[in-house]
Each structure stands twice: as C-alpha cells, then as structure tokens.
C-alpha cells in the first residue's frame, strides 16, 4: 500500500506509507504499560480507524470483531479467520464483564455473545496482511535469523530470509552440516549430539515448522521478533501473497484495491504495461511500482513471481481478487470491446473500475479496476465456490493464474509462451496493439503491447489458465503439463471473459476450466466477451476464421477470451508467425492467446494447445488413461505419412484448417511443427478448414480445438484436442487410425444424433481405448471433433480426419477405410460439410459440431447436432457435460485389446451420444502390422459387435443422461463432477467388457490369420 499512489486509500489504510502501521498513531492512545489497569478501555488507531482496546492480563488487546467489521469488512470471516490462524495469532476470549465493557464502548453490538481479543501487534499484522503493503520485512541483505528446533534431537541453523522465496525454498543452513533445507524439512533434520535429548515431535507435520522453529536467542529484540513473525507469515496460508512482493505489486491491498480501483485503473493505464502487473494484483498496486514489475517479472522477477504463484489459499480476498481480477482483467482485455469489458468488469463489482479501465483502454488498468472494484464489493461472491472445492482449491491456488499472480511458470520463456495468450486480457488495447489486430485499445495499445509481451501485462488471467494447478499450460519448454486439465488456457480467457461478463459467465468460466470446450461454449454463449474477441479475431489475421463472425468471437473468446480471440484466428492465419512467436514452443503460441489481437501471436490456442506444442512429449490426455507419447505420435506420424498422405503437408495444413477452424487452427496451427498435425485435414482446403467447409459460422466454436491442435501434432493431444484433457487420449488415440489401418475405428457418429461413436481403431491405440470419457469436452461430435482435436492433435492428423469422417457416418465405416469413412462418412454425419475432403474437417465441425473443438460448443455441429449440439453443447460444454469429446472408441487392434468402448457421450442436446471411451493410451507397438491385421479382420463381425456395443452404449448414455438431469448438464460444474461422471461411465463400460472379450477374440483370430497369411 505504501507505494500506492492513491492518497485516498493510503489515508484510509495507512497513515504512513513506509509502514503499514504508524507507531505513533497506534501507540498514541496507549497510556503506558505502567498505567495499564485491568479492563482499562483505550482506543487504538489502526489504519485511521479507531479500534477499542481493553487491557487483559496486562496486555492491551483489540477487539477482533470490531476490526473485522471495520477495517476488514471487505473480507469474509472465513478469510479473516484463516489468515489469523496462518499468522499464528491466538485469540483471547473476553469475559462476560469485558464483553459488556466492549458493548458499552461501542466496539460490539449488544447482541454479541463473545468477543475475541488480539494484541495490538497482532492486529497490526493481521490488518497489514490484508491491507498493508505485502512485502517481506525489510532486513539487511546478508541478514540471517539464528533459529533452532527441538524435534527429534533438535537442530540449529541460520534462516536466510533472502533465500526464502517460496515455501519450499532451501533457506535454512544447518549449523552442523552446512547443508541447506527448506523450513518444512529442517524441522525433520537433526544431529544427535551427546547431550541432545530426543523429543518426540509434537504433531510435526510439514507445515508446522512455524511452531517448531524458534529464534535461538531467548530474549530477542522486538524488531527481530516482528521481522521473524513477518517472515514466518510469508508463505503461510493467507499471507502467502506477501511472500513475493513485487516492487510494484502490492497484491495484498485488496481493500485498497477496491478503493483505488478507479484511480488505479487510471494509474495502471498511465503505468502501461507496468501497471498491469500491479493491477494484476489488485489493481491496487501503485502504477509506479507496477511498471518495474513487468520488466522485473520478465527479467528477474520471474523468480519471485513464479514462486509467488502459491497464492494464498486463505487469501480469499486475494483469491477473489485474483479470480475476479483475472476475470475482470480478462473482461477488461476483452473489454477491448469496451462494452463487453465494462459489462464484465461491472459485473465483478470492480465494474466501475473495469469499465473505466476499458475506457482507458489499458488492459491492465481494466484488470486492476475490475479486480479492485470487485474487491470492494467483495468479489468473493462473484467467484463461485467451485474455486474452492471443485477444483481442489485450484482457483485459490491459481487465482494468480487468473492473472493476479505471475504465472507459475514465470520464467521469461513462459512469458513468451503465455504472454501472448494472456495478452488477450489486454486484448482490447494491449493485445490489439500487440497483434495490431484491432484496434481495441488505441491509447493503451502501446502499453498493452508491452504488457502482452511481458508477464506483468499479459499475466492477467487471460494468458493464464485461471487454474494452473489443474491445467498448467504446456510451456514452450515442454514443461509437462497434465493435459487432464483440459483447456486451462481457455479458462483464463474464458474465465476472464466469463468473469468479466458476469457471475453467470464466471460460472461458465469455471465450467470452461473444467471443460475446454465448455469454456468455448460458455464464452460463445456470452457473446459480449466473445464479440469483442470476435472483432479481434476477425480483424487480426484470421483470414479464414473471420468468415465465422460469431465463431471468431467465440473462438476468440475461448482462445483468447477478450483480445486474444483475434489472436487465435490470426494465429491460425499466420501460423508461421505463430510458430515464430511461439518461439519453438507451442506455449508461445498458446501464450499468444491474445494472438487474436496480434496476428503474429501464435494462434494462442489454449495454453493447453501451447502445452501441446510445447510439451509435445507430455501428452497426458486423460486423467485416467495414458496417451501415447511422442514416440507414439511419431510412429503414428510415420504411419500417416503414407496413409495420411502428407502429414508433413498436414502440418501446413493444420495451420490452415486450424485457421479456418478459427480456433481449430488452434488445433493445428499452434503446432504447425508437428508433421502430423492435420494430415486428414489436408483434404480440406487449407483455407477452408474442415471447419470452414462445415458451416463456416460454426467453426468459430472450435476454440477448444486448440488443445486438439497441439494434440494434433502432438501425438499427445493433451486435451484430446477436443475435449478436455481427456480427449487428449484421442489425439493419442491414434488419430492415425487412418484408413491405413482400417481399424475398426468406427467413429460411429450418428449423423442425426451427432453421435460420434468413433470406434477408435487407432492402430497405435491398441487398447488405447482411452475411455476417455471426455466428460469435459463433451463434444457431441466427439468423434469428429475428437478426431479433429484428438486426432488432429495427434500425430495422426490424417487418421484424425478419418476419424471425423467416420464419426460423420458412425455406422459407416467401422474403419473399413478410415479415409473413405472419413470422406464418405464425413458428408454423412456432417451433412453440414459439403465436400468430403472438407468433411473430415467439416464433419468434425459439423457433426462434431464442437468435436473438432470440443471446446467450442458451437461447432457447426452436424446437421442436427448443430442446433442441439450447439446450444446443448454450449451449455453442456459450458457445463462440461460433454463427456465424450472423443467418442472414438479406438480399439486398436494393435493390442489385441482393441477397445470397443464406444461411449456415447452425453448427448449434448441429448441428441447425440458421444462415445466417451477414448482409446487407451495409443500403443506404438507394431502399429503398422496391427493396423494391417485389423484391416484384414472380419470387419463385418467387428462392425456387428461394435454396433451392438454402440447401441448398448447409447442406451446407457441415455440412462446416464436421465440420471444426470437436464440435457444441458449444468452438472458438470467442476472437476470433481467430471471425475465422478467419468468413473460412472467407466463402470458402465466395464459392464460392457463382456462384449469386449468376444470382439477381442475375433480380432485376435483375425490378426492371427492375417499374420499367417502375410507370413
């Protein structure tokens, strides 16, 4: 706060900028210890607010309830309690007599039954953690605390605050062995000296070091004690944010932030990129400091920042601020379209700030304003609890991701990777400036550009997945990122958009988080944010994408909710630029989420997409099933090379379709590098991605595809392309089930039902049957989409196209000829898609509707799908109901275990059932021979079995749907729901396993026969 430029907040919060508390002011009322009489009433001025004090046991204590109701009124009791516990502040209950005194003194309401009293010093620390500058205590550079603990045989060491930059930092040097330990580990480290007595650690758990680690000096000076308290509070629960104070970022000042929201927004605008960082925190940080942060963040700050991402859990305000800020930032960015942004920001409660910011044109300002504003009104409510429970604290943990805190991977590379993406929040100004796409923030553009370039600016949640925890974006470096997170990248954008938009949007944003497609859907659903993106998307470089106006916006929304949307498109249009921008990392591409605004920005598919690109090898698609790794992808690529007819070309293609895809380009473009990206798509004209071929308007929906995109080239389709992470399996799934191996990849895609029962016959996926219930994705066309996304993502671009085709005509090709199926089927399911070649894309688009980009609920779903899938999917996707984004059951005959799970995903509209079973990990084992064998299999028998299974699955699906409730499946609010749904599906599938052995034996026989005949 000290650095906060706003006098208002400063006056309110702290009299003296240098220190949160003004000792004089604080001690002024205090008479003097000698004179303290029991139950003596006094008054202490905390942050300019008079607080009643009472002398209890010779100590002046303040009424916690009064502090909570005045200074901390913007924070929930829960937040305050958690922070108090985290700070190790014990509350003394006052006696009935003391309570009456407090009531009469006006500190407590008459109805109060009890009151906790805390010392003045504790009150100062508590308020400071919420309102004060959140910087670690100022200590000499080479300062170290002499600390010791008595656990086990005890130990002594030097706690070096300068090294304490994360909760796990090795900052304690053992005095005996001179090794460095983290505080958590140090209490378990002891040297058995002759005189040492063993002490059973008293419930020494990893976070109890603050209780066990004591200053060795028994009577330390007060300054030392206070500094030690501050240090101990650093990465602890609520005050965690204080851990990595940025020069310009004072994330802790939430109230201030709300107060300062408007001023800060303006300041942030002034500060430009720098402002973003500060604002990123609460919009409260003074603009001056913020500017440094951006650079610092880029350069060295990343250390702090990237560590910082351990956002306070308790710090609700922070969390809210982060989420809200991210949302509002994102909204602000989205607010590129000022209207949308303003609306979003306003919604947050930081609305005024957000709107103001939007007006200002500074994404950062907007973010700050929104965040701060939200704070004031208490953004807390704005963020549905999903943040807390459903994502296992993801929200809390990664609100920063949302944009409050530096991205967990804040290293510059990450900045490069995500900055583009996050830039989208800046979208309006920054992103556009960067992308030059549009012209959302004229004035802010320059600054925005900067911010977009640097974490600080981009960090708004736009570029970050709001919940890094579950979906850390794949970094360019290939940091492994669990794909199961789905489209984390989207969340940021979607989150930002949604958040910015309104609580409802917020909710959708969360859903999006849960389901990449969902996010897209929700974003789409929320045109306001989407539209701005739409503009951007069309503007930036989305030559093909623009065609789908709505799509663009939606895409953009999904991809780069606010300003990035254009980026996605543009990325698609300028894949090369993307790749360049990506800088060798899909991350960069993903990062360029805002690419929308800056065409060059990598298509900014999702971070996920980026991940895919970046962490090609890591393609954990589903939480449940492993997906083939790079090797698989490569082998698949090889397989496809021939069958797909040019995986390499696909590469370029991907770009194209993706492009057309709009965001689908996400799928591929992000990873143009992947040779297999979109072999199949190749059929489509690059320009008119299948998506395009399909109803062009729908293509926009594909934003989710980004994931797929990467997956495309990444055999690991982390997100399964289409669906969330789960779909990843798809991509792994062997998108290469190309016709080459006419596996029984029956992508049954019921055209009418939009059912994409893709029977994954992924060669690579022998038992890859990833039953990846793409719950999240829930692309009705999972098959197509899945292929688009999953397949496309997978190295088996071609197969993936095929799959879509198959999906198109689910009954049609088992896999007699994936290609044929693809083309033929294509038309079939995707009646939308006019030409078969496009069909692969189109059907994905069409029949898959969102399949290609599961994330995009609105794929031009196939005919029937389109409407129902679109709407339903939108909702569903938003809700993440679409379980099976990758419907293909790829049963890869490779492993005799070809999975036949054709899981019908929930019908989005209820219309289509997608099979959720994804292929299991695609196995790269002898994919070629197996493929051929499978081709030679008794296709008829297999088809029969498969169809039976599909029927069964469909029935199950329906029952499941009924059980689940309305078709829109709002049920899929969160990750846990998703998991439950997936598990339920799995159980159902297990019941179907009886069929599998039969089919498996058939396949085995066929394979044996084929082998014999071949040999």
From Swiss-Prot:
Residues 284-295, 670-684, 694-708, 832-842 have a biased composition (Pro residues). The keyword Cell division does not apply. GO terms for molecular function: chromatin binding; DNA-binding transcription factor activity, RNA polymerase II-specific; histone deacetylase binding; RNA polymerase II cis-regulatory region sequence-specific DNA binding; sequence-specific double-stranded DNA binding; SMAD binding. It holds the Pfam family Ski_Sno_DHD. Residues 575-600 have a biased composition (Low complexity). Coiled coil: none annotated. GO terms for biological process: cell development; cerebellar Purkinje cell differentiation; negative regulation of BMP signaling pathway; negative regulation of transcription by RNA polymerase II; negative regulation of transforming growth factor beta receptor signaling pathway; positive regulation of smoothened signaling pathway; regulation of cerebellar granule cell precursor proliferation; regulation of dendrite morphogenesis. GO terms for cellular component: cytoplasm; nucleus; transcription regulator complex. Residues 628-637, 793-803, 861-877, 885-899, 912-922 have a biased composition (Basic and acidic residues). Residues 730-745, 754-774 have a biased composition (Acidic residues). It is found in: Nucleus; Cytoplasm. Expressed in cerebellum, spinal cord and testis. Isoform 2 is present in cerebellum (at protein level). Its main location: nucleus. Keywords: Cytoplasm, Nucleus, Repressor, Transcription, Transcription regulation. The keyword Cell inner membrane does not apply. Residues 280-316, 518-934 are annotated as: Disordered. Gene3D superfamilies: SAND domain-like, Ski. Residues 653-669 have a biased composition (Basic residues). Belongs to the SKI family. Exhibits transcriptional repressor activity. Acts as a TGF-beta antagonist in the nervous system. Interacts with SMAD2 and SMAD3. This is SKI family transcriptional corepressor 2.
């Amino acid at each position: 706060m000290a650095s906060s430029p706003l006098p208002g907040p400063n006056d309110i919060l702290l009299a003296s900028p240098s220190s949160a508390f003004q000792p004089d002011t604080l001690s002024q009322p205090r008479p003097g210890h000698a004179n303290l009489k029991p139950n003596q009433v006094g008054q202490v001025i905390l942050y300019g607010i008079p607080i009643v004090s009472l002398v209890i046991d010779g100590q002046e204590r303040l009424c916690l309830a009064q502090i909570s109701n005045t200074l901390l009124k913007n924070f929930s009791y829960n937040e305050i309690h958690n922070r108090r516990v985290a700070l190790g502040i014990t509350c003394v209950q006052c006696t009935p007599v003391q309570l009456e005194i407090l009531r009469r003194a006006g500190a407590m309401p008459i109805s109060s039954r009890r009151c906790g009293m805390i010392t003045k010093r504790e009150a100062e620390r508590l308020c400071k953690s919420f309102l004060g500058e959140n910087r670690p205590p100022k200590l000499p550079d080479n300062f170290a605390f002499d600390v010791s603990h008595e656990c086990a045989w005890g130990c002594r060491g030097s706690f070096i605050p300068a090294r304490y930059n994360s909760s796990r930092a090795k900052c304690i040097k053992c005095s005996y062995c001179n090794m460095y330990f983290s505080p958590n580990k140090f209490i378990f480290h002891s040297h058995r000296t002759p005189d040492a007595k063993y002490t059973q650690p008293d419930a020494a758990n990893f976070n109890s070091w603050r209780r066990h680690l004591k200053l060795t000096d028994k009577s330390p000076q007060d300054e030392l004690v206070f500094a030690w308290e501050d240090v101990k509070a650093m990465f602890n629960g609520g005050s965690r944010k204080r851990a990595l104070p940025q020069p310009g970022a004072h994330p802790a000042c939430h109230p201030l932030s709300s107060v300062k929201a408007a001023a800060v927004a303006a300041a942030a605008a002034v500060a430009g990129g720098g402002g973003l960082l500060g604002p990123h925190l609460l919009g409260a940080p003074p603009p001056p400091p913020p500017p440094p942060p951006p650079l610092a963040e880029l350069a060295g700050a990343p250390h702090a920042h990237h560590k910082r991402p351990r956002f306070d859990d308790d710090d609700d305000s922070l969390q809210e601020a982060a989420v809200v800020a991210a949302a509002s930032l994102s909204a602000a960015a989205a607010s590129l379209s000022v209207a949308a942004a303003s609306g979003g920001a306003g919604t947050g409660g930081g609305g005024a700030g957000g709107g103001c910011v939007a007006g200002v044109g500074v994404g950062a300002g907007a973010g700050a304003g929104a965040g701060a504003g939200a704070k004031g009104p208490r953004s807390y409510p704005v963020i549905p609890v999903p943040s807390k429970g459903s994502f296992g604290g993801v929200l809390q943990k990664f609100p920063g991701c949302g944009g409050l805190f530096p991205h967990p991977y804040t290293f510059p590379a990450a900045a490069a990777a995500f900055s583009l993406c996050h830039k989208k929040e800046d979208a309006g100004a920054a992103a556009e400036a960067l992308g030059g796409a549009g012209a959302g923030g004229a004035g802010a553009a320059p600054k925005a550009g900067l911010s977009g370039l640097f974490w600080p600016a981009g960090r708004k949640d736009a570029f970050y997945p709001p919940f890094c925890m579950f979906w850390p974006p794949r970094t360019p470096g290939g940091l492994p990122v669990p794909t199961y997170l789905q489209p984390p990248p989207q969340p940021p954008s979607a989150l930002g958009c949604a958040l910015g938009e309104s609580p409802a949007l917020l909710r959708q944003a969360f859903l999006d988080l849960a389901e990449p497609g969902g996010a897209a859907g929700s974003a789409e659903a929320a045109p306001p944010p989407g539209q701005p993106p739409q503009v951007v998307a069309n503007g930036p470089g989305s030559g093909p994408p623009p065609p789908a106006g709505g799509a663009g916006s939606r895409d953009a929304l999904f991809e780069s909710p606010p300003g990035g949307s254009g980026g996605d498109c543009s990325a698609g249009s300028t894949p090369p630029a993307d790749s360049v921008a990506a800088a060798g990392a899909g991350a960069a591409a993903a990062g360029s989420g805002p690419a929308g605004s800056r065409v060059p920005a990598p298509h900014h598919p999702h971070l996920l997409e980026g991940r895919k690109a970046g962490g090609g090898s890591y393609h954990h698609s589903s939480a449940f099933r492993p997906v083939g790794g790079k090797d698989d992808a490569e082998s698949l690529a090889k397989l496809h090379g021939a069958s797909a007819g040019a995986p390499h070309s696909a590469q370029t293609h991907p770009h194209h379709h993706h492009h057309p895809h709009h965001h689908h380009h996400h799928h591929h473009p992000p990873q143009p590098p992947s040779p297999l990206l979109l072999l199949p798509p190749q059929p489509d004209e690059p320009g008119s991605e299948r998506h395009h071929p399909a109803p062009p308007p729908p293509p926009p929906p594909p934003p989710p595809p980004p994931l797929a995109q990467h997956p495309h080239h990444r055999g690991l389709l982390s997100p399964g392309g289409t669906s969330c992470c789960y779909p990843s399996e798809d991509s792994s799934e062997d998108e290469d089930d190309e016709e080459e191996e006419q596996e029984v990849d029956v992508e049954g895609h019921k055209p009418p039902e939009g059912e994409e029962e893709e029977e994954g016959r992924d060669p690579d996926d022998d038992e890859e049957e990833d039953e990846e219930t793409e719950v999240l994705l829930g692309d009705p066309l999972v098959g197509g989409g899945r292929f688009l996304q999953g397949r496309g993502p997978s190295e088996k671009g071609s197969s993936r196209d095929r799959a879509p085709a198959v999906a198109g005509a689910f009954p049609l090709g088992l896999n007699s000829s994936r290609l044929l199926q693809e083309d033929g089927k294509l038309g079939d399911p995707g009646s939308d898609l006019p030409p078969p070649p496009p069909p692969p894309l189109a059907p994905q688009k069409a029949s898959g509707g969102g399949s290609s980009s599961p994330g995009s609920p609105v794929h031009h779903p196939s005919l029937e799908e389109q409407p129902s899938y679109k709407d339903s999917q939108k909702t569903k996707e938003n809700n993440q109901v679409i379980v099976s984004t990758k419907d293909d059951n790829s049963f890869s005959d490779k492993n005799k275990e070809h999975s036949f799970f054709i899981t019908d995903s929930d019908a989005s509209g209820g219309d289509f059932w997608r099979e959720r079973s994804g292929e299991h990990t695609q196995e790269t084992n002898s994919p070629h021979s197996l493929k051929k064998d499978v081709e030679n299999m008794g296709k008829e028998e297999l088809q029969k079995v498969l169809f039976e299974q599909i029927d069964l699955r469909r029935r199950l699906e329906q029952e499941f749907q009924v059980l689940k409730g309305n078709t829109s499946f709002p049920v899929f609010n969160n990750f846990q729901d998703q998991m439950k749904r997936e598990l339920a599906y799995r159980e159902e599938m297990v019941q179907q396993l009886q069929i599998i052995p039969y089919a498996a034996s058939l396949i085995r026989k066929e394979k044996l026969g084929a082998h014999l005949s071949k040999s």
